[in-house]
Amino acid sequence: MDIDPYKEFGATVQLLSFLPHDFFPSVRDLLDTASALFRDALESPEHCSPHHTALRQAILCWGELMTLATWVGANLQDPASRELVVTYVNINMGLKFRQLLWFHISCLTFGRETVIEYLVSFGVWIRTPQAYRPPNAPILSTLPETTVVRRRGRSPRRRTPSPRRRRSQSPRRRRSQSRESQC
């Protein structure tokens, strides 16, 4: 079966493959980040989002893989074979987990649309011949925000008065503005 773990999130394995292998932090760093940012949501019995569910599954699978690696390390007698298994897990499976964890943590942090826009931008940048592309790759945190997190209820935006607007307003107008900002 050819299963793409990013399909339902609007991305693909191929889209993530444009990022170099050393782009992704270590699994340990990603697990620490997920724990620091999303521990309550990940441990909650409530469903939060598909990204939380995917993160939970990836974390559980990584734990099982580490249990297997520990067992192999303790039970495989041949040091050369043991080293081959450890290297395979770290290089191949480790990269897949690093990509998966990075994707879902980034989607929860920046928003799915921003992450996909970043992946597309980076893919275009990396495939553009060096002579025709800007010297610096796109950076996820500098992309324009597409999602805005707001508290429940609406609070009006503070606006700077335009130069054409008179500075003095009637007291009645001021009171209504202050009443709105308290909501």
UniProtKB/Swiss-Prot annotation:
Residues 149-176 have a biased composition (Basic residues). Residues 177-183 are annotated as: RNA binding. Transmembrane segments: none annotated. It holds the Pfam family Hepatitis_core. Its main location: virion. The keyword Endoplasmic reticulum does not apply. The modification Phosphoserine is found at residues 155, 162, 170. It is found in: Virion; Host cytoplasm. One of its GO terms (cellular component) is T=4 icosahedral viral capsid. GO terms for biological process: microtubule-dependent intracellular transport of viral material towards nucleus; symbiont entry into host cell; viral penetration into host nucleus. It comes from the Viruses. Residues 155-177 are annotated as: 3 X 8 AA repeats of S-P-R-R-R-[PR]-S-Q. GO terms for molecular function: DNA binding; RNA binding; structural molecule activity. Sequence repeats lie at residues 155-161, 162-169, 170-177. Phosphorylated by host SRPK1, SRPK2, and maybe protein kinase C or GAPDH. Phosphorylation is critical for pregenomic RNA packaging. Protein kinase C phosphorylation is stimulated by HBx protein and may play a role in transport of the viral genome to the nucleus at the late step during the viral replication cycle. Keywords: Capsid protein, Cytoplasmic inwards viral transport, DNA-binding, Host cytoplasm, Host-virus interaction, Microtubular inwards viral transport, Phosphoprotein, Repeat, RNA-binding, T=4 icosahedral capsid protein, Viral penetration into host nucleus, Virion, Virus entry into host cell. A motif (Bipartite nuclear localization signal) lies at residues 158-175. SUPFAM superfamilies: Hepatitis B viral capsid (hbcag). HAMAP family: HBV_HBEAG. Homodimerizes, then multimerizes. Interacts with cytosol exposed regions of viral L glycoprotein present in the reticulum-to-Golgi compartment. Interacts with human FLNB. Phosphorylated form interacts with host importin alpha; this interaction depends on the exposure of the NLS, which itself depends upon genome maturation and/or phosphorylation of the capsid protein. Interacts with host NUP153. Belongs to the orthohepadnavirus core antigen family. Self assembles to form an icosahedral capsid. Most capsids appear to be large particles with an icosahedral symmetry of T=4 and consist of 240 copies of capsid protein, though a fraction forms smaller T=3 particles consisting of 180 capsid proteins. Entering capsids are transported along microtubules to the nucleus. Phosphorylation of the capsid is thought to induce exposure of nuclear localization signal in the C-terminal portion of the capsid protein that allows binding to the nuclear pore complex via the importin (karyopherin-) alpha and beta. This is Capsid protein.
